[in-house]
Amino acid sequence: MAKLSKRMRVIREKVDGTKEYSINEAIALLKELATAKFVESVDVAVNLGIDARKSDQNVRGATVLPHGTGREVRVAVFTQGANAEAAKAAGAELVGMDDLADLVKKGEMNFDVVIASPDAMRVVGQLGQILGPRGLMPNPKVGTVTPNVAEAVKNAKAGQVRYRNDKNGIIHTTLGKVSFNEVQLKENLEALLVALKKAKPSSAKGVFIKKVSISTTMGAGVAVDQASLEAQA
């Protein structure tokens, strides 16, 4: 059996894997154990009471976290005319149509989010094999195909997170940075849970939000007692 690193031994000693911690305890524990030489992200895993094999029970969407994610987000927008000017004014780094598609085809993708107006999908549709595997393909379900591209750019810049359950019915996304204070991380988590509950499929029965765990980039998951959150399931 491989020897545990000193860091993992400390985590094992500090984190009780059988316990659910209050949100404030959980955040304090993450901060105590975040000893990496960079500012770690705080991520969340939410186990949903869905059957991910059924397409009508899959959960997908986006929400703006009240305190953002702590990341600088670069946005590319496929649009034209007045929408192009509006996208630039809203802060988009790259705006275009065929010229932007040519950059993507060359592999020049210096952006984190892609937004498109409906009239641009004829161009974007040709890029599915490039953008799709990278999770960058615009989709109306998460607000990245929209006639109001300026608002979508502002949301992306403000700290919008997109979420989609995996094959096990678990949502993975980010809540911010370990440098955020407890209130910021707690309110970001509560905002995400509110959005998830609004996205609950009508065919999903029983408890919808079954388990919530938070972790840092290099740390172990810490289960959160939902009773300590204002947005209880």
UniProtKB/Swiss-Prot annotation:
Biological role: Binds directly to 23S rRNA. The L1 stalk is quite mobile in the ribosome, and is involved in E site tRNA release.
UniProt-recorded name of the protein: Large ribosomal subunit protein uL1
Organism: Aeromonas hydrophila subsp. hydrophila (strain ATCC 7966 / DSM 30187 / BCRC 13018 / CCUG 14551 / JCM 1027 / KCTC 2358 / NCIMB 9240 / NCTC 8049)
GO cellular component: cytosolic large ribosomal subunit
PROSITE patterns from the UniProt entry: RIBOSOMAL_L1 (PS01199)
Stored PANTHER family: 54S RIBOSOMAL PROTEIN L1, MITOCHONDRIAL (PTHR36427), LARGE RIBOSOMAL SUBUNIT PROTEIN UL1M (PTHR36427:SF3)
NCBIfam families reported in the protein's UniProt record: rplA_bact (TIGR01169)
Top-level taxon of origin: Bacteria
Phylogenetic placement of the source organism: Bacteria, Pseudomonadati, Pseudomonadota, Gammaproteobacteria, Aeromonadales
